[in-house]
């Protein structure tokens, strides 16, 4: 079921009121570092950074990490930094791509809490203060706060699987109960030496969130606090379909949390293995596809694994592509 997003101006403001009243200019209030990663998006970047400058949270650091833009994005970012001392602009010195660019931003962040934002998304004015108020109201019990987003194409919430503000268990996230795009705020100390895997081209954010969530409580705020922009450049349908690249993410996901899923949700684990099998088959690797099918069926009988088995005998051109909507990972 999908939930229609409310207008942000109609939402109650009780979550942000404490922040606004107690610490309008208090530098000792927990600093939040927003890492804004960008690459050749001068036409979206300005709107994105303006949404950060309009935030009503009093202690904010903005780290702009540029992945070697060839347009005017970097220069625009530098102009903003000259006018706003809490903005820092850095060039990516890690591997090119979204994972390396995020890691580069993390290297420069000094806040107690971290938020990651893409250069084509916008935050609503009270986004950070509302999430921080949850963090403070519960006396920092929740090291991870997530909120929903409004999709630009249809106005619906981008995050699905939950319909009320409450604590989210590790098992819910592990077993795929939540799906879609969410806005996340998390304690920097949770990272330690952990970083995004720069060898995975796409969709590796979820792996890091699972690692963090396994050892720290998480709270979901059922409000749209980010405008999640859907456009021609943000969907994989406009990319060359690369199943053997996509399957690397599945293999990492399966490997890292195999025992946890085997304990809590074997059916979900079996489906992940079957999906990996389909990707191997689409990439022309029948041998690995067959092994994944056997692994999937050994964990839990499921229809998808059986369907993928019959796909072994079909030409690649006849195989269905996975309907996975995810952002471009360069």
Q: What function would you assign to each model-found segment?
A:
Residues 92-109:
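Glycine-rich, basic loop-to-helix element that forms the pyrophosphate-binding segment
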Residues 225-231, 237-263, 286-299:
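Catalytic core of nucleotide-sugar-dependent glycosyltransferases
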Residues 114:
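Short aromatic/hydrophobic "clamp" motif used to bind/position activated sugar donors
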Residues 158-239:
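Conserved nucleotide-sugar donor-binding catalytic segment
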Residues 30-33, 61, 207:
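Cell-envelope/extracellular polymer assembly enzymes that use nucleotide-activated donors
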Residues 126-158:
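Conserved donor NDP-sugar-binding/catalytic core segment of glycosyltransferases
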Residues 18-19, 40-54:
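Short, well-formed alpha-helical segments that are part of the catalytic scaffolds
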Residues 51, 66-75, 94, 118:
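A conserved acidic beta->alpha catalytic loop
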């Amino acid at each position: 079921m999908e939930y229609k997003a409310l207008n942000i101006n109609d939402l109650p403001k009780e979550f942000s009121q404490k922040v606004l009243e107690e610490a309008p200019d208090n530098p000792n209030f927990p600093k939040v570092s927003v890492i804004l990663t960008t690459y050749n998006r001068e036409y979206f970047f300005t709107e994105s950074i303006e949404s950060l400058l309009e935030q009503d949270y009093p202690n904010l650091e903005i780290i702009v990490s540029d992945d070697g833009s060839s347009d005017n994005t970097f220069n625009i970012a530098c102009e903003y930094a000259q006018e706003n001392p809490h903005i820092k602009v850095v060039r990516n010195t890690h591997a090119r791509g979204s994972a390396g660019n995020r890691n580069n931003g993390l290297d420069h962040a000094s806040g107690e809490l971290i938020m990651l934002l893409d250069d084509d998304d916008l935050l609503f004015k009270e986004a950070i203060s509302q999430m921080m108020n949850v963090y403070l109201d519960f006396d920092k019990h929740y090291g991870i706060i997530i909120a929903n987003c409004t999709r630009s194409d249809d106005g619906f919430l981008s995050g699905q699987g939950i319909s009320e503000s409450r604590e989210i268990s590790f098992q819910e996230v592990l077993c795929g109960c939540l799906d879609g795009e969410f806005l996340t705020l998390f304690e920097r100390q949770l990272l330690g030496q952990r970083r995004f895997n720069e060898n995975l081209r796409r969709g590796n954010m979820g792996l890091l969130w699972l690692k963090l969530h396994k050892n720290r409580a998480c709270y979901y705020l059922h409000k749209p606090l980010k405008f999640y922009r859907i456009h021609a450049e943000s969907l994989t349908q406009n990319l060359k379909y690369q199943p053997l690249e996509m399957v690397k993410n599945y293999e990492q996901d399966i490997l890292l949390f195999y025992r946890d899923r085997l304990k809590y949700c074997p059916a979900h684990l079996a489906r992940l293995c079957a999906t990996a099998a389909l990707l191997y088959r689409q990439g022309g690797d029948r041998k690995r596809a067959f092994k994944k099918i056997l692994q999937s069926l050994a964990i839990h009988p499921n229809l998808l694994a059986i369907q993928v088995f019959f796909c072994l005998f079909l030409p690649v051109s006849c195989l269905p592509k996975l309907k996975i909507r995810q952002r471009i990972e360069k």
